[in-house]
Amino acid sequence: MSEKIHFTKMHGAGNDYIYVDTTLYNIKDPAAAAIAWSDRHKGIGSDGLVLIGRSPLPEADFTMRIFNADGSEAMMCGNASRCIGKYLYERTHPWPLPCKEGDGYQETVIRLLTLSGIKLLFLRIVNGIVESVTVDMGEPVFENERQFNPVIQPPSPRRGAEGEAGSLFVSMGNPHYVIFTNDVDAVETKGCELEFHAAFPERCNIEFAEMRPDGIRVRVWERGSGITQACGTGACATAVAACKTGRSGRKNRIIMDGGELEIEWNEADNHVYMTGPAEFVFEGEIEDPLPAPPLGGVWSAIKIKK
């Protein structure tokens, strides 16, 4: 008889994933599950699958693995990290980590092990509910031969009137190519082409960004998922690129299709800090058939609880 796996769907600024606690359930083929479950017509519908586990290392508390909607595994996801923070705190009783008391709120820190290293999640809690999560995304990298070949230049807008670059490669653990433009909707026609451009050996996430008085308007094409409502690492890469090219200061409001994120590129430690919301959508059970289905197989969701 097929095992039923409990899942929780969450989103951060519209970037939605399916979350499964691997301390309770074993998914035999995560890549196939991500493809099937992410289907918005025949599955649960999401940008991918996130697996939560206990860390095997004493330096971290929990682990995160992310599989995109096409089954490929991602190094890091800022929005998923925030959702994991909310999920863990509100679903773990009693809470095992120290909490700091503030004026009408509490704070706790989670050390999350990802494929791009350990990330710190700073949770702000009011009346037992996680109000917001700030993630230390680490330092940006501008040169990474494994992710970007500068000899093969991808298409880029002309330089601005004062000579600032029209685009910039930024790695936030995963690769991003940020293009400054007045037409962010061009992501719909150019995103896929750029993801697979020869300049990016491991493919690339693509951001089309427009500088506005109220912040930076960004639309994103995520590697392995296509157009998404938001991308945490993409928001960080865009803010860093805007600052690096002289378009903005170190604190930026990033306006994406699904919501807004606050990004700070801290001058003292060179780390990028991302703050934003995390929300539950629904939960339910889904069957994990034996053996694992072939890629593209569909697993039917049952007992959805709003």
Q: What does each model-found stretch correspond to?
A:
Residues 140-143, 150, 168-170, 271-291, ...:
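C-terminal domain-closing interface element
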Residues 154:
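Cationic, low-complexity basic patches in intrinsically disordered or flexible, solvent-exposed regions
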Residues 129-137:
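Short, solvent-exposed secondary-structure boundary/capping segments
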Residues 1-99, 104-129, 177-290:
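A glycine-rich beta-to-alpha transition motif near the start of alpha/beta enzyme domains, typified by
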Residues 101-103, 159-161, 296-298:
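Glycine-biased, low-complexity coil/linker segments
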Residues 100, 104, 165, 301-304:
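Intrinsically disordered, low-complexity segments enriched in serine/threonine/proline/glycine
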Residues 109, 151, 301-303:
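Generic short N-terminal amphipathic or hydrophobic helices
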